[in-house]
Amino acid sequence: MLDTLERNDSTGSAANAEHFDVLIAGAGISGIGSAYHLQQQCSGKSYVVLDMKDTFGGTWETHKYPGVRSDSDLYTFGYRFKPWVGAPIASADEILKYMGEVIEENAIGPNIRYGHRITACKWSSADNRWTVEAIRLADGSKATFTCNFLWMCQGYYDHEKPYTPDWEGVSDYKGLFVHAQLWDPRTDYAGKRILVIGSGATAATVVPAFAEKAAHVTMLQRSPTYFFCSENKNELADRLREIGIDEPTIHRVVRAQIMHDQDVMTKRCQTEPEVVFEELKELVRLFTGKPDFEFAPHFTPKYRVWQQRLAFCPEGDVFRAAVEGKVSVVTDEIDRFTEKGVRTASGEEIEADIIVAATGFRLSVMGDIPFSVDGKAVNWNDTVTYRGMMFTGVPNMAWVMGYFRASWTLRVDMMGDFVCNLLNHMDKMGAKRVDVQLRPEDQGMPLSPWIEADNFNPGYLMRGLDKLPKRGDKPEWRHNQDYWAEKDQIPATDLTGAEFKYS
């Protein structure tokens, strides 16, 4: 059983607050991984994990649309400490099973409080602690916690309010209109005409899944996306199993292989994007068996490969469905919704029984929770990030922000090491507080938005840059997207450096 702790008091007042050394916000892939590292590396510290849902899983529990699966391989998306045994691309149910095993095997469950929505985080310099206010969703009562260190692992997008453009005429449409993020799994779509708006990772997942039962699926995209087609297996892992190698060794070796290949791929996308695109097209031809497969205009993006995430396409399923006539693609702008469907800018009307918006999500910085330091509200856009983990002017807090191109969880493990090293260092010093601060040589450093648009520019980030902290022009003051650089830099961090201020 994954038991939760129960609180004795019901007033929710600060006087009755429960105190923990560390409070972890979120019981998704980041929060569970962080809890594991805290238990292993800071075994004497008390902690609690708060999550608004009634179970663990985060994204993988929230998303219910057909075919929901990872868009990263599970050898690298899985934790480094627990081997992944299975196909590289996994379903949400398989990922939840994996996470549940981590919770059970490491007795994390008793430290998780489900059904708690955090409403405020307040730092007091007088007390050197955070006060975290929450609401118990079961009955609406208030709960208050205090902690020495706050570890934000709640992800970076809004699970309840996805991004939906303000299309004209939506209310005129007589069929079912829903955002993929809010899909009800009880919906019967067999034999229906389905229109999917979007072309990113979500569309790449739902389109072939819908095509299995729907009468027909149309994917309407404003602009094309790059797809990476591959078999859903890892030959090296399969071969090592055949010769009797143990799973921990397989996990370690295959992770290293995949991370190396991803690093090479990322660099090639920057130095020879045209060559990489030709290779991606060749994979489509291979999986469809169509050497004359036509890529223009629907599968020829206008941006460079890897400026946005590649949409993974196991077994070429999207393209095979298109070749089989189950799926059609339209590249156009939406003029307006009509009673029967959507009219495009070019005048074509696409009729559908169900319209699914796969238009991305809305960025949520720190869960959109109000933060304050000594009574002053925190505006994250006024802060400068330390390696995408900590922030100037905000003491005793870390935020897990993973990689965009590589698997998110690689950074969860790395940050777990960093935060635990920091906490242990503070204990040795007898410090109660740590701030990150610009060093003398950083004064006057030019500050820029969180990430360069020329480097990585998905819509959700571009729409939310004004909510995110600033970055500097030095490695310490930016969220580096290069795992291979960070895997050496972050473990070698000098915690006595001038960028850290202890008291």
What is each PLM-predicted segment?
Residues 203, 226-229, 248, 384-385, ...:
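C-terminal, flexible cofactor-proximal segment of oxidoreductases
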Residues 70, 79, 167, 299, ...:
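Short clusters of hydrophobic/aromatic residues that line enzyme substrate/ligand-binding pockets
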